[in-house]
């Protein structure tokens, strides 16, 4: 993916991989070390870029490289 990622694209990817109902629950509950021990939701709220947060989520979920 080139360029910055919008928050809406981040959530579209989350919905695609985890389902719309579960994506928010997962993002609110999974603490990821690479996000300074924050959940994805906390990291986004703290101002981390959606692209950086997606990379950490991608690694945690062990998604195939094509979904990067």
Put a short name on every predicted segment:
Residues 1-68:
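C-terminal alpha-helical interaction appendages
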